[in-house]
Amino acid sequence: MKTAIFSTMAALAALLTLGGCGKIDLVPAETGRVAQLDSSHGLRSWSLSGAQESRILALNPEHVTDADVRHTLAGAPAPHIITIHGGIATVIKRLESFSRFLNGLGYPEQAMRHPGGGNRTISCYEDAEMIAGIVAWYYEREGMRPMIIGHSQGSFQAVKALQLLAGQTADHLSVWSPIRWRPEDRTEITDPLTGKKHPVVGLKVSYIAALGGGGVTRVLPNQWDMMFSLRSVPDSVEEFTGFYLGLDVLGGDMLGWGSTNHYHATGSARVRNVKLPTGGFLTHGHTPDLDRMLSNPPALAWINNYAPSLQPVAPKEIPGKLEGIEFGADVWKSVKRHWVIELQRLIRARHGNRHGA
């Protein structure tokens, strides 16, 4: 047993050494731009016509077509997506690829870049307190609850942030500014929909996608505190989808087989577990690398018309390299749903505030 544990940790150490550390610098905005970004980011930076608002309110969140994205939602704001990459440097570009993939499908680039230095992704080595704090900042500024996409150890951090927001591991949390990349001296926000004060603890994320969280990365010291709670999803998220792969040594419990990879709700959160097609050793890191799909029309057609499944498999008739397409399609379906839900929620609240004034 000791030999097996030592061998596993040695393999992980070698992988981290060869792959490089996945920590990236979160560069704050230049001093001269801080005030401008502070004053312009969020609700004050956009307006929609009454006609477009009516079309958005008429959308069915469960069936958002490519035409809806390209026309009805074009130019509309979107919930910020916080992407958290794993612990190896090579996965950074793959999460950036996934960010570009969503942009190419029609999701606003501004909603995937942090306003400080323009980062598309943050490291799993950042504190979960920071992640929870920027969730609060984005919600207060934008009026839409953010989404989180976590890959590998990024999935651990996503769940840690949920535990913090649920009050399971903290009584108070600071708001964090992604413009300055530092905490603010407050633990409350003004709820943009009600105008009332609300502590950071108790806020919700709209959607989380957690890909390849578990496996041998559980033995890393920075994840020991999640050994027995990784699969427990608290009420601080509306919808949570866990993705796992067969033969995934790095991110799959029992090599990605069976219910040990399944997340479960501790309360009212909607939780799905999706088994992706079995791959090889490299599939764990390569799955999010999907911007190549943007130049494959048959693949895009399948992605845009995807019907959710707990074991999705793309048709073999689609040409080209398809690794990861099922992950991309399922996430895009959920992202579209929560984009519409959050935007409709914001529009209705603004109408209510006008009528109540």
Q: How does the language model describe each region?
A:
Residues 220-357:
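C-terminal catalytic-base region of ester-bond hydrolases, centering on the histidine
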Residues 95-99, 158, 254:
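Short, highly selective alpha-helical patches that border small-molecule cofactor pockets
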Residues 109, 127-253:
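Serine-dependent carboxylesterase/thioesterase catalytic core
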Residues 82, 113-115, 209, 239-243, ...:
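Hydrophobic/aromatic beta-strand patches that form the interior of the parallel beta-sheet core
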Residues 32-146, 316-321, 325-355:
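Active-site catalytic motif of lipid deacylating hydrolases and related acyltransferases
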Residues 1-4:
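Positively charged n-region of N-terminal signal peptides that target proteins for export
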Residues 7-17:
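Bacterial N-terminal signal peptides
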Residues 17-37:
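Bacterial Sec signal peptide processing site at the extreme N-terminus
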